[in-house]
């Protein structure tokens, strides 16, 4: 944000017509227009089970603060257009599957190629101790980082246990087993 890269990308998208200013001053990305070729775009289920149509997405809030989506577009623009990488490979949590089409569409909108983005969707890792799930919550500050994990589990054991699973399948990572595996 401090470098001005996010603002520059938003300005470019406005200039190209991929975004517009809403009445409240927010800058909106025409998500459905650009992302449809990559799949379903941010449709949401209503209370009665039907799906709402895709809506335009906020890039810059009415208060002037950019969303993380705007920063993501700027990151990919920097990587592919400015630094000249041929491909970007992102690893996202599976809960972000609905964002793949809009990101690829945004890349097309700004003059890149959405096909140059590969997204690996990872399922969640459940940590287990004594056969019970380790309860975690980012909101309460009760989380175990990878650094924390590697203080308890040898790195080779962690690598082996993570790599024996496909990215698309959930992992029950047994801390007790990981320590035993190393011995």
Please tell me what each predicted stretch does.
Residues 1-69, 75-76:
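Active-site neighborhoods of enzyme catalytic cores
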Residues 76, 82-183:
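Catalytic adenosine-cofactor/nucleotide-binding cores of aminoacyl-tRNA synthetases and other
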């Amino acid at each position: 944000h401090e470098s001005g890269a996010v603002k520059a990308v938003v300005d470019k998208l406005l200039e190209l017509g991929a975004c517009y200013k809403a009445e409240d001053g927010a800058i909106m990305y025409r998500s459905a227009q650009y992302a449809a070729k990559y799949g379903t775009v941010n449709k949401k289920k209503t209370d009665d089970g039907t799906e709402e149509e895709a809506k335009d997405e906020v890039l810059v809030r009415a208060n002037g603060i950019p969303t993380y989506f705007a920063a993501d577009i700027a990151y990919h623009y920097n990587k592919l257009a400015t630094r000249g990488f041929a491909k970007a490979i992102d690893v996202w949590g599976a809960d972000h599957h609905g964002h793949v089409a809009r990101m690829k569409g945004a890349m097309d909108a700004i003059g890149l190629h959405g096909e140059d983005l590969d997204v690996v969707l990872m399922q969640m890792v459940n940590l287990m101790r004594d056969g019970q799930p380790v309860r975690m919550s980012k909101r309460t500050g009760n989380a175990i980082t990878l650094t924390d994990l590697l203080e308890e589990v040898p790195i080779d054991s962690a690598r082996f246990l993570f790599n024996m699973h496909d990215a698309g399948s959930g992992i029950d990572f047994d801390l007790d087993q990981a320590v035993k595996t190393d011995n």
